[in-house]
């Protein structure tokens, strides 16, 4: 059995600002955009297998989440079962949701994002790749999200260090 942690985050022109190094006595300038173009990254990680599954979509809704469940299902090896841990967002709890045969859903308690290691992934991606920058178009946002997600997903050591918790006991 594999435990997967799933979540979504928004990335766009109203991005985040983070601290940066600057010479002593200077104030660095950071551009803040006024436009509102954005995309969402749907992401899931499996700390035990150091694997992840992600999609970049224009909105969060039932259809996008259904596609993400199918993507997670694709990443689960034949003969294994995945327990996907997630919050109770409205699109996660629809009755018409078609859950793949190799996945079970486990919902986190309300208002407990600290129990989802995927939140650390978002913080890392935003701090390292997506903060303190501007985006000229939707394609620019998608490219930046793709580059950030690919850099993360190609580093098994980073997946492990950001998402492994001592309280995750796997079968």
Regions found by a protein language model. Give the residues of each.
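Short functional hotspots at interaction and active-site rims
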Residues: 1-171
């Amino acid at each position: 059995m594999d435990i997967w942690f799933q979540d979504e985050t928004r990335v766009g022109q109203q991005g985040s600002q983070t601290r940066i190094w600057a010479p002593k006595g200077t104030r660095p300038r950071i551009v803040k955009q006024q436009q509102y173009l954005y995309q969402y990254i749907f992401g899931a990680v499996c700390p035990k297998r150091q694997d992840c599954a992600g999609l970049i979509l224009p909105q969060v809704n039932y259809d996008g989440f259904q596609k993400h469940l199918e993507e997670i299902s694709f990443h689960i090896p034949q003969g294994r079962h995945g327990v996907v841990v997630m919050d109770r967002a409205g699109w996660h709890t629809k009755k018409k949701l078609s859950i793949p045969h190799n996945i079970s859903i486990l919902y986190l308690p309300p208002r407990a994002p600290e129990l989802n290691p995927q939140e650390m992934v978002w913080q890392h991606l935003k701090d390292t790749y997506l903060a303190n920058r501007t985006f000229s178009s939707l394609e620019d946002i998608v490219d930046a999200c793709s580059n950030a997600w690919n850099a993360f997903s190609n580093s098994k050591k980073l997946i492990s260090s950001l998402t492994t918790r001592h309280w995750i006991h796997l079968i």
